[in-house]
Curated annotation (Swiss-Prot):
Domain of life: Eukaryota
Family matches, as Pfam families: 2OG-FeII_Oxy, DIOX_N
Gene: ACO
Names of the cofactor(s): Fe cation
Cited PROSITE patterns: FE2OG_OXY
Protein name: 1-aminocyclopropane-1-carboxylate oxidase
Length: 320
């Protein structure tokens, strides 16, 4: 099996741009994941985010998690299939931030997370334009496709997770296998404790921890908009007996009322090869369905949305 794709973004500026773009396209077509190094986010900022995240978990969340899970380990044989061995909270950035409302964060932590989110947003839009270039779409098409009808903005937020040592890793997953419902996911993960895996060709493959990297993975909405040229893939977090794994997954998703459908240019390009197979829907409707079916295959979700597509038949497509 090929090695996990790592993209050096500095090479996009020189003579190796074409080869680097090809690597990105191959990663999107065959992996649904790739890892960015030498990106635009300062390593000093990433170090601060990591320090503050780990301090916050230790001070405010670790004991709560231990107390919550202690009793559940006893019934693990019954409950493990419906539980994830993770401690999380969620920060919303767009369309309206809730950062000031998150309890127990210091002013320093809020300031650093705000700056980090701004850098991630710019990086997400840069990556989306790289995808547009590879797909032959107009620059900015994916950003426009993600824009909410009302706000003109995407939905953007960060899931802050810690995966503590697990005494029964044979029974618990850190996070059960799933595809991500949204658009583009940017992950800043622990560079010391592994655990993230993706499903490729029927085998679980480790996503290697690398210092100061950002892992990119594609969500279900990218699969729909690209008419299946790029696909979301199943991934999971494996619980570990040693070490606490930090994970900050930032989701650059469509606005809740954004209308999602295959890009007409891609449907036309592939018309001779296959028929359009992906539905047209409002993103919020998909999220409502996903909430109850997250840990199941994505294909039945797409089928349900196809059946509901008549409800949005009168909505106008985005033009290229």
């Amino acid at each position: 099996m090929d090695s996990f794709p790592v993209i050096n973004m500095e090479k996009l500026e020189g003579q190796e741009r074409a080869a680097t773009m090809k690597l990105i396209n191959d990663a999107c077509e065959n992996w649904g994941f790739f890892e960015l190094v030498n990106h635009s986010i300062p390593v000093e900022l990433m170090d601060e985010v990591e320090r503050l995240t780990k301090e916050h978990y230790k001070k405010c969340m670790e004991q709560r998690f231990k107390e919550l899970m202690a009793s559940k380990v006893e019934g693990a044989v019954v409950d493990a299939n419906d539980m994830d061995w993770e401690s999380t909270f969620f920060i919303r950035h767009l369309p309206v931030s809730n950062l000031s409302e998150i309890p127990d964060l210091t002013d320093e932590h809020r300031k650093v997370m705000k700056e980090f989110a701004e850098k991630l947003e710019k990086l997400a839009e840069q990556v989306l334009d790289l995808l547009c270039e590879n797909l032959g779409l107009e620059k900015g098409y994916l950003k426009m496709a993600f824009a909410g009808t009302t706000t003109g903005l995407p939905t953007f937020g960060t899931k802050v997770s810690n995966y503590p040592p697990c005494p029964r890793p044979e029974l618990f997953k850190g996070l059960r296998a799933h595809t991500d419902a949204g658009g583009l996911i940017l992950l800043f993960q622990d560079d010391r404790v592994a655990g993230l895996q993706l499903l490729k060709d029927g085998e679980w493959v480790d996503v290697p921890p690398m210092n100061h990297s950002i892992v990119i993975n594609l969500g279900d909405q990218v699969e729909v908009i690209t008419n299946g040229k790029y696909k979301s893939v199943m991934h999971r977090v494996v619980a570990q007996t040693d070490g606490n794994r930090m994970s900050l997954a930032s989701f650059y998703n469509p606005g809740s009322d954004a209308v999602i459908f295959p890009a007409p240019a891609l449907v036309e390009k592939e018309a001779e090869e296959k028929k359009e197979v992906y539905p047209k829907f409002v993103f919020e409707d998909y999220m409502n369905l996903y909430a109850g079916l997250k840990f199941q295959a994505k294909e039945p979700r797409f089928e349900v949305m196809k059946m509901k597509a008549v409800e949005t038949a009168n909505l106008s497509p985005i033009t290229t």
